[in-house]
């Protein structure tokens, strides 16, 4: 049974207006930004490792380099495509390496530093000098830095992006009130990594990402797409696993979060239900694409500001519908929900949605992948007699 007839008129009208519009706007015309291809991965990760290794007092560049590292994992062409599809017309310049001369103990050395738009190569040269100084100091003591404490450890780039994932979860607030929370969370989750790199400036790195996302909002689209891609790939290192967990939590703490059928009042990310990261991916992508169809950022605000309408308009997303049913109808709102909802209006909207599903006999148990025990519990809570085949329920 189609759920289209459950849509509210205002949602249908908005959908029609948006889908029939023949025009678009172009943003950020004249902006110039670097984009990095796969070949730049090693150099970008190594530079990020230097920020972790040293107590470098200029961390404002670290976020830009971190996003370039994310682009290098996505690939140059895909990164440009993401920017274009998000409605940004920025001029993209390929990241390259440039020769630079530094002096160490009276001797000149030729090195290569990253050539990135908006970053002074001299700062990166100073960073290289400090990193070499840390390594030399260790060698003087007769010790050798373990491989996982060096600036060229393979997971340095992802460690920095873990902090970015925490920052994304706070962007919806519109201010930096969450900076201290980001720092505390990062020091807790990245405890082992902080032990490896005791000079890691977590707060400064977080501030760098706040600044970057404010100056270049198009990087948010790049980072979210990267996070989805990274989180959907099986395997990987321990830190990559940490990133996936942090990103998916951030993707739920920010924009449109459904937990027990309640839409949280925040903007930028989506996370649905209580399933694992892998199981959430289809639901996340589904609603993210819906919001993009509604007009990108405007789509997220539409979902946030119209909870009742949005719950109904999103019923054309099958994975979303099954999660709403599992959380709102099956596991809480109808039946034995305990506790006082923080927002009564949102609670009532979700409850009304769940009841409509029930009244119109559109509950599809097979879409929920329930155990026999869960199915029995939901049937009891919904007060439904299960006397029809699975696919027809």
UniProtKB/Swiss-Prot annotation:
Subcellular location as annotated: Virion; Host cytoplasm
A molecular function annotated in GO for this UniProt entry is:
RNA binding
Major location (coarse): virion
A Pfam family that the UniProt record links to this protein = Pneumo_ncap
Asked if the keyword Transport belongs to this entry, the reply reads no
What are the BP-aspect GO terms?
Answer: symbiont-mediated suppression of host innate immune response; symbiont-mediated suppression of host PKR/eIFalpha signaling; symbiont-mediated suppression of host type I interferon-mediated signaling pathway
* Record keywords, A-Z: Capsid protein, Helical capsid protein, Host cytoplasm, Host-virus interaction, Inhibition of host innate immune response by virus, Inhibition of host interferon signaling pathway by virus, Inhibition of host PKR by virus, Interferon antiviral system evasion, Ribonucleoprotein, RNA-binding, Viral immunoevasion, Viral nucleoprotein, Virion
InterPro entries documented for this protein: Pneumo_ncap
Gene Ontology, cellular component aspect: helical viral capsid; host cell cytoplasm; ribonucleoprotein complex; viral nucleocapsid
Recorded consequence of changing residue 234 to K: In strain: Non-pathogenic 15
- Into which family does the record put it? Belongs to the paramyxoviruses nucleocapsid family.
Q: How does it assemble?
A: Homomultimerizes to form the nucleocapsid. Interacts with the phosphoprotein P. When in a monomeric RNA-free form, interacts with the phosphoprotein (via N-terminus). Interacts with protein M2-1; this interaction allows the association of nucleocapsid with the matrix protein.
Function (record text): Encapsidates the viral RNA genome by forming a left-handed helical nucleocapsid that protects the RNA from nucleases. RNA replication depends on the availability of soluble nucleoprotein. The encapsidated genomic RNA is termed the NC and serves as template for transcription and replication.
This chain's protein is named Nucleoprotein
Q: Give the organism, scientific name.
A: Murine pneumonia virus (strain 15) (MPV)
Q: What is the lineage of its organism?
A: Viruses, Riboviria, Orthornavirae, Negarnaviricota, Haploviricotina
